[in-house]
Every structure is written in structure tokens, then in C-alpha cells.
């Protein structure tokens, strides 16, 4: 195991981390107070109500201002909730919109395929599971909501990759590398790129036990009203049931479901 050496005196790291956590908690408390105060307040009121020193309150507000989470009225000097908070909230609402629209289609897909249905989004260089509808089979393959999946080695991950422009795709792969999870994980660039090209042509991608041994997945990209990929929908099941002879029929079913969701989100033409 590689030893990580830190500069400074022994025992210094923990107090620094504690101070950082305390500053974060106080920053969140300020945002929550502004929200309860109708979106704005004076620095003195914030300081008084949160029992913080005035200098500390002002310093935290300046940090939040640098992140666009708050801004100061130049005339009155009051502090207001900024655009950064709106952007964070908008991302949450957008994801919830995808799920609320996808819900009926997920149920239909689950009933037609007989497999568990998942919805995932891309978060940086990972896919994150945000929605799931378990199948009714006694044997089913499920992962907890919030699970993180490798982009190159999961059905949902590859569905989030194949619509991307080659430059962005290569950038992601170079950053993440091609870690091997199972004997069938695609760990060389030419093979992965060929797999993604085929997925682009078919409108769906297949994960043949590439992330978990015994688990197969079929996934397709979901697009918003401007044609940007916003999520992926997949079915997952044991490889003994979701067998290779079902890949085409189930792949077309997943692809058509993704297209229906994309249309419901406002996409005018199929990509």
C-alpha cells in the first residue's frame, strides 16, 4: 500500500478537516436562512439569527458569492440567493422531470420484458442510478439507487457514451481508463469504440456480464427536446434468463421505450 505523506505537524489534518466541515455547515445554514427569509437578508440579521460572528458571516458570504450562490445588492447591501442555487435546483428538477415522464414507460417496459428497469444519468465520469422498477420474477438483479456505474463497463454507462462526439468520448475514456471488472469487460480502446459505434447504429447497447458476472443489461439513450442525451434506460437480468438469443428483441424494445420517453420530453425527430 502506498503511504500518503502530508506536510505539517502530526495531527494537523484532522482539525483542518473539521474546520472545513464546519465552514460548509455554516455556509449551508446561511443559504437555508436566506430561503426562509424570502430569499434575502442583511449580514447583521444572518449573523444574529445563526449566532455567528459578523466577520465570519461576511467571510462565508464572500465565499458563497464567488460560487454565484449569493449576490449583494449594491444599494441596500442586502444579500440575496444567487443564480448558482437556481442552477443546482434546476439540475435536480430536470432529473425529477425525466423520472416523472419515464415512469409509465418504465412500467410498460418492465411488464413486456419481464426484467428490472433502470434509469441512470451521467455524473462526471460515472453513471448514477436514479430510478428503478423491479421486475416480478423471483430471481431479479437490482442495485441500490445512487449506485455508481463505470461508463465503459455497464449498459447504462455505454448508452450515455455512444451518443457523444468522438472528441468528448475520447476525453472521458482517457480520464477514466478502462478498468477490468470481469473477464468480458471491454478493456482496449478499438474494441470499445467498435462496440459503441454498433450501439449508435442499433440504438441500444448490450452489457454482456461486463460489470458483474452473471448480469446482462441492455440500454438505450434518452434525449431531451434539443437532442442532448440526458439519461439512459436499461433492463437488467441474470444471464441465465436475459440470454443472447433475446438481445435483439429486447434491445429493440428498450430502444423504442427510450424513443417514446425522448418524444415525451419534447424531442421532435428520432436520432
From Swiss-Prot:
Entry-linked PROSITE patterns: HTH_ICLR (PS51077), ICLR_ED (PS51078)
Gene: allR
Keyword vocabulary terms for this entry: DNA-binding, Repressor, Transcription, Transcription regulation
Protein's name according to its UniProt entry: HTH-type transcriptional repressor AllR
SUPFAM superfamilies hit by this protein: GAF domain-like (SSF55781), Winged helix' DNA-binding domain (SSF46785)
Residue ranges of the annotated DNA-binding region, renumbered to this chain: 43-62
Molecular functions (GO terms): DNA binding; DNA-binding transcription factor activity
HTH iclR-type domain ranges (all copies): 21-83
Domain of life: Bacteria
Binding residue positions for glyoxylate: 154-156, 207, 217, 234-236
Function: Negative regulator of allantoin and glyoxylate utilization operons. Binds to the gcl promoter and to the allS-allA intergenic region.
InterPro entries the record matches: GAF-like_dom_sf, HTH_MetabolicPath_Reg, Tscrpt_reg_IclR_C, Tscrpt_reg_IclR_N, WH-like_DNA-bd_sf, WH_DNA-bd_sf
Domain IclR-ED residue range list: 98-267
GO biological process: negative regulation of DNA-templated transcription
Alphabetized Pfam families for the sequence: HTH_IclR (PF09339), IclR_C (PF01614)
